[in-house]
A protein has these predicted regions:
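Active/ligand-binding-proximal structured segments within catalytic/core domains
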Residues: 58-72
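Beta-lactamase-like hydrolase cores
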Residues: 18-57, 76-82, 115-123
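Conserved serine DD-peptidase/penicillin-binding transpeptidase domain
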Residues: 76-333
Length: 343
């Protein structure tokens, strides 16, 4: 996949001199040309500069990020910030306004509640969460049920936090005995622990799969282990995980509150900003285009759709934004079907 992305960057750079033969050389040096379908046009005059198997249908995979991230960047702007804000009302209520920040961490929540405590906010009447920036769809069209164990494809929502991944720490015990399995930080999962400790092995051979015969959040852990192993897996319920981490930081700051976190829209009057955390667009573009991060790509795509439509983020708004952007470049889209932001 990195070769494919490198290929397209090379094509774009080559086009500055409009030398089709260099494009051909680049393609032949990087990948098997029979596996490529590409058409390169000069957008200033819509003339084709180079093509190869241009009518062959192909799944773009993560090369799609070049298109969707360009449209999103054009819509949001390079100075866009992913922000999470904490407000206080005159009624002593707190409002946590989520911005679907794909870089938000539990440490960021801790910083926010530390500031709240420093401002003597010790006994809030209620703590509300405003998650209205996105709809409730957390996966892209075509994502499969068995993708939910893939750490490269976590769910994404207004409640993005900690890369939307759990860390499962598996620690061997005595020979032929089951290891300990701990979720750090805590999240309620049940494991059917069928792993055996074998100190004679040179490496671990472990698998964790969802058990479809029992209730949700039950997993089969199988294999053999000889040393500590940490496994990343997507968070099953982002909202639940987020609220657990919010509990952690509120309790750590000794803020007196135990009433839950109902959803509510941030009021427009009688509130003031307590504190906020933010991350910048260049970090997102680097994450999308250098490491092909699906979580960041999907989040940015959905945020751009929200801004373009001036309403809640949804895939339909994102696709509308994308079509508008591509049309502005005089590129026909009649034969193109795009269903998500990451490919």
């Amino acid at each position: 996949m990195r070769k494919i992305i490198s290929l397209f960057f090379a094509i774009f750079l080559t086009l500055s001199s409009v030398q089709a033969e260099n494009v051909t050389k680049t393609i032949n040096s990087l990948i098997n040309k029979d596996a490529v379908s590409v058409s390169v046009k000069d957008i200033s005059n819509n003339k084709e500069v180079y093509s190869l198997n241009k009518k062959a249908p192909m799944i773009p995979a993560s090369t799609l990020k070049l298109v969707t991230s360009s449209a999103a960047l054009n819509t949001l702007g390079s100075d866009y910030e992913f922000s999470t804000k904490l407000y206080k009302s005159s009624n002593n209520d707190l409002y946590l306004k989520l911005g679907a920040d794909p870089f938000l961490t539990s440490s960021d929540l801790k910083k926010m509640m530390t500031v709240a405590k420093e401002k003597n906010i010790l006994e809030p009447k209620n703590i509300y969460i405003d998650s209205s920036i996105f709809d409730n769809v957390e996966w892209g069209e075509g994502w499969q049920w068995d993708d939910e164990m893939n750490p490269l494809m976590p769910k994404f929502s207004a409640y993005n936090i900690d890369e939307n991944l759990l860390n499962i720490e598996i620690t061997p015990s005595m020979q032929n005995m089951p290891p300990s399995i701990v979720v750090k930080p805590f999240y309620p999962l049940t494991f059917m622990n069928l792993i055996t400790t074998d100190i004679t092995l040179s490496k671990n051979d472990i698998s964790i799969v969802k058990n479809l015969n029992f209730a949700q959040n039950v997993y089969d852990a199988k294999g053999e282990i000889t040393k500590i192993e940490n496994i990343k897996m997507p968070i099953p319920n982002l909202q639940r995980y987020f609220k657990l981490r919010l509990d952690d930081v509120i309790n750590a700051q000794k803020i007196d509150y135990n009433k839950g976190y109902p959803n509510a829209i941030l009021p427009t009057k009688n509130i003031y900003l307590v504190t906020s955390v933010a991350h910048k667009m260049p970090d997102a573009m680097e994450s999308i285009l250098k490491t092909s991060n699906n979580l960041v790509a999907e989040t940015v795509f959905k945020l751009a759709g929200a801004k373009w439509a001036e309403e809640k983020g949804s895939i339909s708004n994102s696709l509308g934004m994308l079509k508008f952007y591509i049309s502005s470049l005089n590129i026909p889209t009649d034969d193109v079907k795009i269903v998500d932001g990451s490919g």
